[in-house]
């Protein structure tokens, strides 16, 4: 039905077509960042968002990245043309080789890869692809997991039931491996997807041992579960990119499991705002790889058309040059090393204060985060001390430095004593 200009309905604030919508909750991490920014206190600490900070509490552009940016800027051949739908070819190959360890030609023929909008885009693309191609009834997600995992699967795979497998043991601040395996053994069904953190688990900082990874792979084979790895922190757990890729490579090397991996370069290259990522699928044969990749490219075209080029150029430039790659690996060691130093410093300060509870888990955990064991009540009390972390107790350790670690430890000591509730017992 058509309208004349005079007959067009006028929508005011009171009768908008969108007034039926409920206001969605804001993201808690970015909300906390806003609270921190508004806090007028001179002494304060933000342990919220998962970004690396240097000893001065400032963003750190990796020296290798700075060097390559200058080289790209001075290259007269640099342009801003569209990339292919699957992304910058040399980047996609470099990302694949970094993750899978320079795979053999026979393995390469079974790996399909394309560039994505960082790790979030890779998880989204994978969720949508698996929803459309495999129609799984359930996806198993660790309890807890990165909060955005839930939202991504809600949007990209709304008909897939999200189930939680036990992961964190609050009594010991350690991995509940027995509970995890028992739940998956008894309740997971053939065809279910299982989401696994490749290393530096977010938010707990607790990873399975290699022997435990082998048992998880055995279970996936036995139960016919489909592994979906999220690799957001390669190089941040141990400081060694090969060591941190061990779980993914072990699953692949068994030769019995098809799987997918979402890969992010935000953390290990410090390219948070450039949104550099990749998605990989490992199939049982080359024909299946080609078919799956064609569907992934089809989805990519409909959603973003082409991924952005700048950050991908930086990563590819570094990974394709042995000298630059070696320099970047040193940058990684600096970042992971400082985080480990800050873990030890916080633990040492709490020990010196004789803060009630066992805090050994802070140094036992790895990667960017610590699941401190602090309760929501204690976390909220910390905000009055101008210390900001998530209500789950997750703390971004890179937010600590030599100037604020004593203040943070004293604040934790204060709220723990005031609450009379020690957050952890001896493991």
Regions found by a protein language model. Give the residues of each.
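Short catalytic/ligand-binding loop motif for oxyanion handling, primarily in non-cytosolic enzymes
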Residues: 53-58, 203-204, 270-271
């Amino acid at each position: 039905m058509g309208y004349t200009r005079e007959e067009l309905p006028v929508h005011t604030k009171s009768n908008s077509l969108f007034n039926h919508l409920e206001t969605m909750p804001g993201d808690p991490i970015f909300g906390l960042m806003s609270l921190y920014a508004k806090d007028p206190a001179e002494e304060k600490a933000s342990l919220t968002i998962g970004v690396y900070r240097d000893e001065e509490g400032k963003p750190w552009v990796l020296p290798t990245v700075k060097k390559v940016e200058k080289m790209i800027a001075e290259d007269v051949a640099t342009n801003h043309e569209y990339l292919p739908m699957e992304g910058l070819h040399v980047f996609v190959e470099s990302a694949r080789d970094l993750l899978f360890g320079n795979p053999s030609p026979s393995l390469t023929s079974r790996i399909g890869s394309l560039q994505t909008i960082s790790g979030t885009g890779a998880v989204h693309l994978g969720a949508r692809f698996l929803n459309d191609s495999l129609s799984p009834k359930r996806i198993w997600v660790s309890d807890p997991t990165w909060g955005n995992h839930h939202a991504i699967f809600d949007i990209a795979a709304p008909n897939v039931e999200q189930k939680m497998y036990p992961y964190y043991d609050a009594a010991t601040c350690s991995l509940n491996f027995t509970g995890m395996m028992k739940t998956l053994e008894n309740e997971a069904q053939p065809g279910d997807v299982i989401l696994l953190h490749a290393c530096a688990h977010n938010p707990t900082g607790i990873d399975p041992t290699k022997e435990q990874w082998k048992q998880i792979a055995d279970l996936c084979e036995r139960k016919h579960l489909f592994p979906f790895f999220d690799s957001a922190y390669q190089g941040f757990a141990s400081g060694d990119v090969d060591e941190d890729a061990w779980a993914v490579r072990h699953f692949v090397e068994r030769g019995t499991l098809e799987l997918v991996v979402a890969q992010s370069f935000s953390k290990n290259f410090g390219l948070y705002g450039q949104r550099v990522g990749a998605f990989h699928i490992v199939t049982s044969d080359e024909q299946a790889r080609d078919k799956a990749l064609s569907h992934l490219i089809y989805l990519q075209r409909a959603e973003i058309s082409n991924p952005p080029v700048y950050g991908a150029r930086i990563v590819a430039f570094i990974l394709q040059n042995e000298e630059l790659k070696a320099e970047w690996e040193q940058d990684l060691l600096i970042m992971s090393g400082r985080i480990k130093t800050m873990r030890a410093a916080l633990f040492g300060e709490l020990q010196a204060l004789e803060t009630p509870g066992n805090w050994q888990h802070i140094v036992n955990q790895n990667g960017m985060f610590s699941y401190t064991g602090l309760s929501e009540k204690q976390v909220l009390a910390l905000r009055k001390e101008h210390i900001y972390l998530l209500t789950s107790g997750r703390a971004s350790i890179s937010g600590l430095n030599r100037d604020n670690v004593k203040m943070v430890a004293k604040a934790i000591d204060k709220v723990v004593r005031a609450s009379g509730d020690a957050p952890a017992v001896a493991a």
